[in-house]
């Protein structure tokens, strides 16, 4: 009988003892961004990716089965054509409905045949083509080819080669000075805000890698290049 009472006492004590609440596992931190898994393109997860030299959003999107515009949206990228090495991106991976079009602006028809103010030569870089160079100066391909009759094959150019760009007569820049790169600067935005082209910036900064600039770097920066009216 004593054993029965002892067992009952122990059993009651077991039920009466306070139970420790279950320990919850903290969720893994999510990469920073403006969306969350499931709200962007139907993605169920975000992945951090550090941009390398030569990367494009298109290639990164393809690698992670994402969308160019989805990545741009999450990371606050205004121009999907311009990302910088060492930039950390939050990638919505395995998109159900990837968006590759909504953020892409229509390509403007280029009709200019000369460059305003400055930039009469350009030094070819690895990966360049005549077409890409013409676009960077916002001039037609035909006008760039016409300025370089010394080149026998426009499809065969090499790094370090200097080509001519057609400079507009009676055109000037309001100023040409130095500029110290600040955090967040990219060449495309600097060109737009100073009313010049990326090609002009590249032509004046031959030894600068335009996709890999850092705060404190010093570049040559023209401002507001334009046509002038000849004096009467």
UniProtKB/Swiss-Prot annotation:
Residues 1-16 form the signal peptide. GO terms for biological process: effector-mediated suppression of host pattern-triggered immunity; effector-mediated suppression of host pattern-triggered immunity signaling. GO terms for molecular function: chitin binding; lytic endotransglycosylase activity; PAMP receptor decoy activity. Induction: Expression is up-regulated during wheat leaf infection. Residues 47-91, 120-165, 177-221 form the LysM domain. Gene3D superfamilies: LysM domain. It comes from the Eukaryota. Pfam families: LysM. Disruption phenotype: Severely compromises virulence toward wheat leaves. Produces no to only a few pycnidia. Coiled coil: none annotated. Glycans are attached at residues 48, 100, 138, 195, 209, 227. GO terms for cellular component: host apoplast; host intracellular region. Keywords: Glycoprotein, Repeat, Signal, Virulence. In plants, chitin acts as a microbe-associated molecular pattern (MAMP) that is recognized by lysin motif (LysM)-containing plant cell surface-localized pattern recognition receptors (PRRs) that activate a plethora of downstream immune responses. Belongs to the secreted LysM effector family. Secreted effector that enables the plant pathogenic fungus to manipulate host defenses for successful infection. Binds chitin fragments and blocks the activation of chitin-induced plant defense responses. Protects fungal hyphae against hydrolytic plant enzymes. PANTHER family: LYSM DOMAIN-CONTAINING GPI-ANCHORED PROTEIN 2 (PTHR33734), MEMBRANE-BOUND LYTIC MUREIN TRANSGLYCOSYLASE D (PTHR33734:SF22). The LysM (lysin motif) domains are small globular domains involved in binding chitin in eukaryotes. Mg3LysM contains 3 LysM domains. This is Secreted LysM effector Mg3LysM. It comes from Zymoseptoria tritici (strain CBS 115943 / IPO323) (Speckled leaf blotch fungus). The gene is Mg3LysM.
């Amino acid at each position: 009988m004593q054993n029965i009472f002892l067992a009952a006492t122990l059993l009651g004590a077991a039920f009466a003892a306070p139970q420790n609440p279950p320990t919850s596992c903290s969720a893994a931190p999510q990469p920073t961004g403006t969306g969350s898994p499931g709200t962007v393109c139907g993605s169920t997860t975000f992945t951090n990716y550090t941009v390398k030299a030569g990367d494009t959003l298109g290639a990164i999107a393809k690698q992670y089965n994402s969308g160019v515009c989805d990545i741009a949206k999450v990371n606050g990228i205004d121009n999907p054509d311009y990302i910088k090495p060492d930039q950390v991106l939050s990638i919505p991976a395995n998109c159900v409905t990837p968006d590759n079009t909504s953020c892409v602006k229509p390509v403007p028809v280029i009709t200019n045949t000369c460059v305003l103010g400055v930039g009469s030569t350009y030094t070819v870089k690895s990966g360049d083509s005549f077409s890409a160079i013409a676009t960077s100066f916002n001039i037609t391909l035909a006008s760039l080819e016409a300025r370089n009759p010394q080149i026998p094959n426009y499809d065969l150019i090499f790094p370090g080669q200097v080509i001519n760009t057609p400079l507009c007569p009676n055109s000037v820049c309001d100023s040409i000075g130095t500029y110290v790169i600040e955090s967040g600067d990219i060449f495309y935005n600097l060109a737009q805000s100073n009313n010049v082209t990326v090609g002009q910036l590249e032509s004046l900064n031959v030894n600068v890698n335009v996709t890999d600039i850092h705060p404190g770097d010093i570049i040559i920066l023209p401002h507001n290049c334009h046509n002038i009216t000849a004096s009467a």
